[in-house]
Amino acid sequence: MNNNSSGGKAIRGLDVLILGFAFFATYFGAGNLIFPPQLGLNSGSDFLSGLAGLTLSGIFLPIFTLIVIGLNGDVHSITERVGKNTYNVLLAALMLVCTFVSIPRTCATAIQLGIQGNLPAAPFIPLVIAYFVISFFFVADQNNVMDRMGKYLTPLLALILVIVAFVGIFNPLGTPVAPAVDHPFVNAFLGGYNTGDVLVSFIMAAVFISSIYGKGYTTVGQRNKVLIYCGIVSFVLLLIIYGSLLYMGACVSGDYAQNIGRAELLVAIIQRVGTWVMVPMGIAVVLACLTTAIGQIAAVAEFTSTATGNRISYKQVAVACCILSALTALLGVDGIVTYIGWIFGICYPPCLALLVLGIIGRFMPNNSAYKGSVYLVTLFALLESLPGLSSLGFAKAIVAATPLSTYGFGWIVPFIIGLIGGSIIGHFVSASEPVEAEAK
């Protein structure tokens, strides 16, 4: 691969491979290791339909989101038509989610599932400290975070997973039985959709794009090409791993109850592959968690230092993030999960709305179309998920009456209403309003 965009250096295949591996590792957290077997268990003999649904929502959608953000320039280019402070508010909220939810959860999962699963007596607190010391080591060099991950951590993670996948595919664990759900495609699509990996694209976009620039690809054309190539590498890796895990779940669909826990099912599958897999899979869990944490700590540090005009340095923010996340990780997986649902429910719909706007933005007649859709989607998300508000009678009634809300797509109707209503209001009230940012 030696494509040469005018005014820049040739695109090197090794660079694409390293960055693509790093992108893959950032998306592939331990949660992504656990849920495909469950979807396979549900899909049974119709596992190909399940894989198609998971591929569309759990692989294509997040990577497509990243590419859309890149082609628009950055997240700010999409949000600025909603309002000048939208970018800072959105990213600040997502960075808080990283610091107090997703990063601590990776740590707790790595220790409880990856380490204590093999060494039950391993001490929790010292391991938490070690986890974030290692994370900071990789994060400290701002310009080479993705490069370090792609060179050292991700190849080992991918190697372990590919070996297990190879064994699981070519030495089937059983024979898939009839699907336990009526529509395996829809079930798997919703399973992938509800992982919320689209949020990762919004959180990590700046770090991903910065890592491409750091490789010397400084023109817009080069950046976009490398981003797309890296997306393809990441897509292929995720498809191989997800597909094999889903297939292994399908192969044991006649042996386990549908209500078996996700982690319990994964452990059962690993044991059936062979006890020799327990330690390598434990390492894979730790690496999957660690690479996700490293990427998100870097994102928090980069956003915060930039937002403060570097009055707080990148390294200072990284240290603070590690400390706060470590303290939160002490709650353990169960303690963190108790408050994760409503936070996810509020943040996810506005990001999906922005994704759609990033695609169709050039066709929007005015900025009010942006404002109306995002504001109404955010209001719906608050009614649906905010503790205290979501339990009120009127909020429940509105959510229940909204089409598709039972499937997690309730935001679509408010989005369409806001888009149309905003366009009309913008036409009559703000006809003279200039378009502040054209879609790129």
What are these regions (language model features)?
Residues G40-F136, A140:
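Membrane helical hairpin/interfacial module
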Residues V164, N171, N367-K440:
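A generic transmembrane alpha-helix motif of multi-pass inner-membrane proteins
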Residues I18-Y27, T55-G58, V89-A93, N118-A140, ...:
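Transmembrane alpha-helical segments of multi-pass small-molecule transport proteins
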Residues D141-Y152, P184-A188, F208-L237, G254-V267, ...:
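Hydrophobic, small-residue-rich membrane helices and short re-entrant helix-turn-helix hairpins
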Residues S102-C107, M278-G309:
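Membrane-helix boundary/coupling elements in multi-pass transport proteins
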